[in-house]
């Protein structure tokens, strides 16, 4: 099962990297749709994308600290690389990426803690 998650994780990472690094002009989105996507919506999208990234890597690899570290570094590196595209660097993107990772981390921590408690009561 871990092998399956590794494949999905790397595929997701590639697609995410492409989506975050290609210029927005290359997306088939009209100017009207781009204007409708507010900064708040974009931040929520970043949060969800990195929530999923951490979740997938969590089930793919055993060293949880390295996964957390990778997601943090990846978030910063991708944002820095956006300086060289027409997208630009935004500190709030990094913040919401990291919030997504943190929420995913806390969600899994809570889930497994409750699962352990349920086993103890049986």
Give residue ranges: language-model regions.
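Bulky hydrophobic segments
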Residues: 1-94, 98-122
């Amino acid at each position: 099962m871990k092998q399956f998650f590794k494949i999905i994780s790397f595929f997701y990472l590639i697609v995410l990297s492409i989506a975050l690094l290609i210029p927005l002009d290359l997306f088939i989105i009209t100017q009207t749709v781009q204007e409708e996507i507010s900064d708040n919506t974009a931040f929520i999208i970043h949060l969800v994308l990195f929530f999923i990234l951490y979740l997938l890597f969590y089930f793919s690899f055993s060293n949880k600290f390295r996964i957390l570290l990778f997601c943090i570094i990846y978030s910063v590196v991708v944002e820095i690389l956006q300086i060289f595209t027409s997208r630009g660097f935004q500190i709030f993107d990094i913040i919401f990426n990291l919030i997504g990772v943190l929420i995913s981390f806390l969600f899994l921590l809570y889930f497994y803690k409750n699962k352990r408690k349920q086993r103890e009561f049986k």
